Amino acid sequence: MDWGTELWDQFEVLERHTQWGLDLLDRYVKFVKERTEVEQAYAKQLRSLVKKYLPKRPAKDDPESKFSQQQSFVQILQEVNDFAGQRELVAENLSVRVCLELTKYSQEMKQERKMHFQEGRRAQQQLENGFKQLENSKRKFERDCREAEKAAQTAERLDQDINATKADVEKAKQQAHLRSHMAEESKNEYAAQLQRFNRDQAHFYFSQMPQIFDKLQDMDERRATRLGAGYGLLSEAELEVVPIIAKCLEGMKVAANAVDPKNDSQVLIELHKSGFARPGDVEFEDFSQPMNRAPSDSSLGTPSDGRPELRGPGRSRTKRWPFGKKNKPRPPPLSPLGGPVPSALPNGPPSPRSGRDPLAILSEISKSVKPRLASFRSLRGSRGTVVTEDFSHLPPEQQRKRLQQQLEERSRELQKEVDQREALKKMKDVYEKTPQMGDPASLEPQITETLSNIERLKLEVQKYEAWLAEAESRVLSNRGDSLSRHARPPDPPTSAPPDSSSNSASQDTKESSEEPPSEESQDTPIYTEFDEDFEEEPTSPIGHCVAIYHFEGSSEGTISMAEGEDLSLMEEDKGDGWTRVRRKEGGEGYVPTSYLRVTLN
């Protein structure tokens, strides 16, 4: 069944139907285009979301990246990013294979439809013109027949009229004959026109228009087939990415199963274990018998041997609670000469410094200045720690681990250089045996450089081994002190003996005398040691930065800067949003990190 046979008289219906089919094709293309925009926006939002939650710092600089929870989260973000890439691929396939191709095909269909309907309308116009000619010849034949009949009646009436002349009768007969001849010609022309029209009409309805309708039917069926294929492309584009999306989902599942709480707990220990010994028991201080002190007892506390008692900074400071807030350390109160504050008693004895040897006084000043400078340095270290090569700024356990890492890295580099030296030696032997392969002298600079690197790395390995051994011994001693301290039962805080103050003083003196003197105190003269303590520790910039915005720096600890000003970076942001910088004309302070463009050395 075809349109040319069954719908031979439904030209307008076919015109509307084919137009509806093309409109449907355009609507589907528009739908897919909007679907593509949705996919692209979805993928863009997913990528923005992933970028928002990805860690800003590199994994090697981020301690949190060592936890399995963080690693799984980063892996999930990467899988989501891959998923977004698949959504972009779906959008691209739909845009190219559906939107572009169907739009081009729709334009071709519209041109073909226009051509077929123009051909049909042209055939209709030709048939209408033939019908008009048939009507004209028919009306002419009808008019000529009436006039011929009228002329024949006139000639017959004159022929019967006795008053009519012979000339009038002859004229009427000639007129009747002429009209009869004209009617006969009109009849023949009408018959020929009718025959021609019937032939054209039969050709129009049985051949010409059915062919046009069949072409329209074929065009519409091809359009429907292509549209159905376009419907299938919508699902095929999804099915093509299903395996990769399934891998993304499987990766998310693997990341979820990779969370290891026990390992994270161990990682936290590895990252933050200090290696310090636990604090010992707080000693009981008896203030109930202040009058039993010796008259010569002062802030320096002269023991029985006549030497002034000097308490170290660790004994005079408030006990540090490890779980409390980290307050800034304050320097111990000092007298104008650098010693402890004299006794507050108005009638107290004079200071034992009077009549002392000046060298002894200078020695006491040097020893008392050390805690003060140490407290100032610890105060500055609370704002920005100076990193040392032996990692002595870290707690013992962390120092040991960092030294172990550095030692392993240097050992690997040393082994690499040794292997390279062996390879160069073999290559040199080959060149010496077969000179056409190369000049042995050309390898001498590389061999020399390799030997220099080996010597340098050996020295570094020895240096780190010594530091590591010292750090390990320190960790072991801290562990031993902690165990022995906890094994000793605490002293009862009740019923102290009357001479507890003198006992504690003598005990402190005994403990201080049992401590081995350092190499610095043995070899360095007192005046040199005193001068070195007052020297400012140099701090070199770790980078430079440029001020993006103007900052007033009105609050305490901050510094003002102008927009575009070049500054030296002294300390990175510790997570509080502030960075310590130094101006070229002098002066250091903190400025907002978001106001800077930072470049590390």
Swiss-Prot record:
- Record-annotated F-BAR domain positions: 1-264
According to the UniProt record, list the residues that bear Phosphoserine: S296, S298, S299, S335, S351, S482
Instruction: Look up keyword Coiled coil and say if it applies.
Output: yes
Annotated Basic and acidic residues bias: 407-420
Positions of region (Required for interaction with FASLG and localization to lysosomes): 471-601
Which Gene Ontology biological process is one annotated for this entry? signal transduction
- Give start-end positions of Basic residues composition bias: 314-329
A single GO molecular function term of this UniProt record: lipid binding
Q: Where is the segment annotated Interaction with WAS?
A: 544-601
* Coiled-coil regions, chain positions: 67-259, 388-481
Subcellular location as annotated: Cytoplasm, Cytoskeleton; Cytoplasm, Cell cortex; Lysosome; Golgi apparatus
- Spans annotated as Required for podosome formation: 538-601
Please list where the region (Interaction with DNM2 and WASL) is annotated.
487-541
Residue stretches of biased makeup (Low complexity)? 336-346, 497-506
The residue ranges of the REM-1 domain are: 393-470
Positions of the region Interaction with DNM1 and WASL? 529-601
Q: Where is this region: Interaction with CDC42?
A: 293-537
Q: Where is this site: Mediates end-to-end attachment of dimers?
A: K166
Q: Which InterPro entries match?
A: AH/BAR_dom_sf, F_BAR, FCH_dom, HR1_rho-bd, SH3-like_dom_sf, SH3_domain
Where is the segment annotated Interaction with ARHGAP17, DAAM1, DIAPH1 and DIAPH2? Answer: 546-601
PTM annotation, UniProt = Tyrosine phosphorylated. Also phosphorylated by PKA.
Q: What family is reported?
A: Belongs to the FNBP1 family.
Protein's job: Required to coordinate membrane tubulation with reorganization of the actin cytoskeleton during endocytosis. Also acts as a link between CDC42 signaling and regulation of the actin cytoskeleton. Binds to lipids such as phosphatidylinositol 4,5-bisphosphate and phosphatidylserine and promotes membrane invagination and the formation of tubules. Also enhances actin polymerization in the vicinity of membrane tubules by recruiting WASL/N-WASP which in turn activates the Arp2/3 complex. Actin polymerization and dynamin may promote the fission of membrane tubules to form endocytic vesicles.
The entry's free-text remark on domains says: The F-BAR domain binds the phospholipid membrane with its concave surface. The end-to-end polymerization of dimers of these domains provides a curved surface that fits best membranes with around 600 A diameter, and may drive tubulation.
Q: Tell me the subunit arrangement.
A: Homodimerizes, the dimers can polymerize end-to-end to form filamentous structures. Interacts with AKAP9, ARHGAP17, DAAM1, DIAPH1, DIAPH2, DNM1, FASLG/FASL, GAPVD1, LYN, microtubules, PDE6G, SRC and WAS/WASP. Interacts with the ligand binding domain of the thyroid receptor (TR) in the presence of thyroid hormone. May interact with CTNNB1 and HD/HTT. Interacts specifically with GTP-bound CDC42 and RHOQ. Interacts with DNM2 and WASL.
What is the name of the protein in this document? Cdc42-interacting protein 4
Which species is listed as the source? Pongo abelii (Sumatran orangutan)
